[in-house]
UniProtKB/Swiss-Prot annotation:
One of its GO terms (molecular function) is rRNA binding. CDD domains: KOW_RPL26. Belongs to the universal ribosomal protein uL24 family. Signal peptide: none annotated. HAMAP family: Ribosomal_uL24_B. GO terms for cellular component: ribonucleoprotein complex; ribosome. Gene3D superfamilies: 2.30.30.30. This is Large ribosomal subunit protein uL24. It comes from the Bacteria. One of two assembly initiator proteins, it binds directly to the 5'-end of the 23S rRNA, where it nucleates assembly of the 50S subunit. One of the proteins that surrounds the polypeptide exit tunnel on the outside of the subunit. It comes from Carboxydothermus hydrogenoformans (strain ATCC BAA-161 / DSM 6008 / Z-2901). The lineage of its organism: Bacteria, Bacillati, Bacillota, Clostridia, Thermoanaerobacterales. Keywords: Ribonucleoprotein, Ribosomal protein, RNA-binding, rRNA-binding.
Length: 107
């Protein structure tokens, strides 16, 4: 299974599906399922029973995971959606880089 090139906190652009062209921050990464949860994207309605957390129950809207192939990382320096590359620093540390401008994506 290939390693995911996105991390929690990355800004991404949705490139396919019902929420195409929406931007959002990654809230959660699910590496075993190759999916990510993006803030404000793929909102679904869940019908919940009354429970201690939600005493009245009802319909709750929440974000559902989308496949990682449907999102592209937005480079913080050039602001464009880009593919992610890897680069080794002089001290042997591996970082993620923007394929368009070559700048680091890691904070």
């Amino acid at each position: 299974m290939p390693k995911l090139k996105v991390k929690k906190g990355d800004m991404v652009l949705v490139i396919a599906g019902k929420d195409k062209d929406k931007k959002g921050k990654i809230v959660q990464v699910l590496p075993k399922e190759n999916r990510v949860v993006v803030e404000g994207v793929n909102i679904v309605k869940r019908h919940t029973r009354p429970n201690p957390k939600l005493p009245q129950g009802g319909i709750v809207e929440k974000e559902a995971p989308i496949h990682v192939s449907n999102v592209m990382v937005i480079c913080p320096s050039c602001g464009k959606p880009t593919r992610v590359g890897k680069k080794f620093l002089a001290d042997g540390k591996k970082i993620r880089v923007c394929k368009k401008c070559g700048e680091s994506l890691d904070r």
